[in-house]
C-alpha cells in the first residue's frame, strides 16, 4: 500500500467514525416526526401576541407573489396580524400592480417601495423599523404557508426565552424535475434530522429564511449588529438567516424548530441556479463558523459534536477523495476501501431516512452523494477561497440607499432580472 492509499484509507475511516458517531447521536436526539401538533392558547387572561409578517420581494413573478400573499391572508391566526410587502427596487413593478391592488382593500396589508435595490437584509430592516408587532415573521416572496403556520410558531414563542423559531420547509415545485425532488428530500433531512436534533437543546443553528419568526424585543436589540455585518472590511449581503440566528444564540436566546408549521418554497429546478445558491450558502456558513465556534463553550456536548461534524467531516471526506485520486493516477489502482465505505454509509443513511419518513423515495437520495463528491465539495473549496466575495451571482450588488418610506408607486418600468426566489 503506497502513501496515497494509506492516506485515503486513514481519512475515510476517520470520516466514517466521525459520521457514525455524529449521525447516531443526531437520530437519537431527533424529535419524533409524528409528535402531537403544537396546540393550545396563550396563558389564561393573556391575548395572542401581535405579529408582523415581512415579505421582501425583488422582481418576483406576479403569480408566485400572489400565491404567497394568499397563503398569508388565509391564516387562521386569532391575534392581530399586519403584513409588510417590501418591493426592493424591482424592475417589474408594472406587472405586480394587479397583485397589490388585489390586497389594497385589506387593512392588514401594507405595501412599501424602496427607490433602489438595497438587498434582502436592508429590505427586511426597512419593514422591521416601521412595524411594531410583538413577533416578526420573515417570509420569502416565493413561499406558501400552511393556514396554521403563524399560530403554531406563535405558540412556540410563548416561552420568553425563545428568540426565534422556524417551520418545516418543503419544495413547492417538488414534482418539476429530478433535482427539485432531490432538494425536497434534502430539505426534509435538514429539518427533521439536523434542526430537530438541535432543537432538543434550544439551539437551532440556522432558522431558515423562507419561514422564521423572531421576538421583536430580541430582534431590536440585535438589529444594528445584523445590519452592519462585515467580513474582511466589506459588508456581508447574504446569509442573513444564519447570521441572525447566531446573534440570537450569542445573546442567550433559544432558537426552536416547529415541524408542524409547514411552509413550501420554490427551489432551483436546474443545476446552475442550484450551484450558485449552494455557493452563497457555503460562503455564509464559513463566515459564521467563527461565531459558531465562540458558542461552543456554552453548548451541550451534542451541539459541539454537531458543529465539529459539519466542519471537519467534509474536510476528511475531501482528503480521502484527493488521496484516492492521487492513488489512481500514480498506481492505476482503484481506492476500493474509500469507495465501499462511502457506498455503505450512503445506503445506511438513505435507508434510515426512508424508514423515518415512511417513504421509499428517500432511497433515491443516494444520488446526492455523487453530487456532493463531484460538485459540492469542490464548490465549498472554492467558496472557502473566495470568502470576501459578496456577489449574489444572479444580480448586481445592492446599493446602499436609505428607505424613503413611500407607498408603492406604479412606475413605467419593464424587464425582469433574477428574483429573490432564484437567489435564496
From Swiss-Prot:
Instruction: Tell me the GO BP annotations in alphabetical order.
Output: extracellular matrix assembly; hyaluronan biosynthetic process
Instruction: Spell out the CDD domains in the cross-references.
Output: CESA_like
Pfam families membership: Glycos_transf_2 (PF00535)
Q: Which GO terms describe its cellular component?
A: plasma membrane
Recorded hits in InterPro entries, A to Z, give: Chitooligosach_Synthase_NodC (IPR026463), Glyco_trans_2-like (IPR001173), Nucleotide-diphossugar_trans (IPR029044)
User: What does the record give as EC number?
Assistant: 2.4.1.-
Origin: domain of life: Bacteria
- First-level EC class: transferase
Q: What topology in the membrane does the UniProt record assign?
A: Peripheral membrane protein
Q: Report the subcellular localization.
A: Cell membrane
Q: Which GO terms describe its molecular function?
A: hyaluronan synthase activity
- Which NCBIfam families is this protein grouped with? nodulat_NodC
- Please give the function described in this protein's UniProt entry: Involved in the synthesis of Nod factor, a sulfated N-acyl-beta-1,4-tetrasaccharide of N-acetylglucosamine which initiates a series of events in the host plant species leading eventually to nodulation.
The Swiss-Prot or TrEMBL record describes its family as follows:
Belongs to the NodC/HAS family.
UniProt-recorded name of the protein: N-acetylglucosaminyltransferase
Question: Which organism was this protein described from?
Answer: Mesorhizobium japonicum (strain LMG 29417 / CECT 9101 / MAFF 303099)
Amino acid at each position: 500500500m503506497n502513501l496515497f492509499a494509506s492516506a485515503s484509507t486513514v481519512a475515510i475511516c476517520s470520516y466514517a467514525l466521525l459520521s457514525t458517531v455524529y449521525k447516531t447521536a443526531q437520530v437519537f436526539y431527533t424529535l419524533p416526526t409524528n409528535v402531537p401538533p403544537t396546540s393550545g392558547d396563550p396563558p389564561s387572561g393573556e391575548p395572542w401576541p401581535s405579529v408582523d409578517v415581512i415579505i421582501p420581494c425583488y422582481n418576483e413573478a406576479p403569480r408566485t407573489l400572489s400565491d404567497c400573499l394568499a397563503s398569508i391572508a388565509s391564516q387562521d391566526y386569532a391575534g392581530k396580524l399586519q403584513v409588510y410587502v417590501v418591493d426592493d427596487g424591482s424592475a417589474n413593478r408594472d406587472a405586480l400592480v394587479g397583485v397589490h391592488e388585489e390586497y389594497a382593500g385589506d387593512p392588514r396589508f401594507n405595501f412599501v417601495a424602496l427607490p433602489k435595490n438595497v438587498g434582502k437584509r436592508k429590505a427586511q430592516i426597512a419593514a422591521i423599523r416601521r412595524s411594531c408587532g410583538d413577533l416578526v415573521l420573515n417570509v420569502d416572496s416565493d413561499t406558501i404557508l400552511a393556514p396554521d403556520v403563524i399560530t403554531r410558531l406563535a405558540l412556540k414563542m410563548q416561552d420568553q426565552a425563545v428568540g426565534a423559531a422556524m417551520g418545516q420547509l418543503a419544495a413547492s415545485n417538488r414534482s418539476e424535475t429530478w433535482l427539485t425532488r432531490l432538494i425536497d428530500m434534502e430539505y426534509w433531512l435538514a429539518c427533521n434530522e439536523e434542526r430537530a436534533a438541535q432543537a432538543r437543546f434550544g439551539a437551532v443553528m440556522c432558522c431558515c429564511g423562507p419561514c422564521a419568526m423572531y421576538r421583536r424585543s430580541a430582534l431590536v436589540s440585535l438589529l444594528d449588529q445584523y445590519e452592519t455585518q462585515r467580513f474582511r472590511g466589506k459588508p456581508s449581503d447574504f446569509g442573513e438567516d444564519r447570521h441572525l440566528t447566531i446573534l440570537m444564540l450569542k445573546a442567550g436566546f433559544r432558537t426552536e424548530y416547529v415541524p408542524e408549521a409547514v411552509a413550501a418554497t420554490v427551489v432551483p429546478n436546474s443545476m446552475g441556479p442550484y450551484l450558485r445558491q449552494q455557493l452563497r450558502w457555503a460562503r455564509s456558513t464559513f463566515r459564521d463558523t467563527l461565531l459558531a465556534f465562540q458558542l461552543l463553550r456554552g453548548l451541550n456536548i451534542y451541539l459541539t459534536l454537531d458543529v465539529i461534524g459539519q466542519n471537519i467531516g467534509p474536510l476528511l471526506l475531501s482528503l480521502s477523495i484527493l488521496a484516492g485520486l492521487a492513488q489512481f493516477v500514480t498506481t492505476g489502482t482503484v481506492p476500493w476501501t474509500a469507495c465501499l465505505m462511502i457506498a455503505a454509509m450512503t445506503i445506511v443513511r438513505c435507508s434510515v431516512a426512508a424508514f423515518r419518513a415512511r417513504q421509499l423515495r428517500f432511497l433515491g437520495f443516494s444520488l446526492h452523494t455523487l453530487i456532493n463528491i463531484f460538485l459540492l465539495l469542490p464548490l465549498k473549496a472554492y467558496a472557502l477561497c473566495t470568502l470576501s466575495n459578496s456577489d449574489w451571482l444572479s444580480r448586481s450588488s445592492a446599493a446602499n440607499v436609505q428607505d424613503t418610506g413611500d407607498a408603492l408607486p406604479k412606475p413605467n418600468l419593464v424587464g425582469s432580472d433574477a428574483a429573490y426566489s432564484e437567489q435564496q
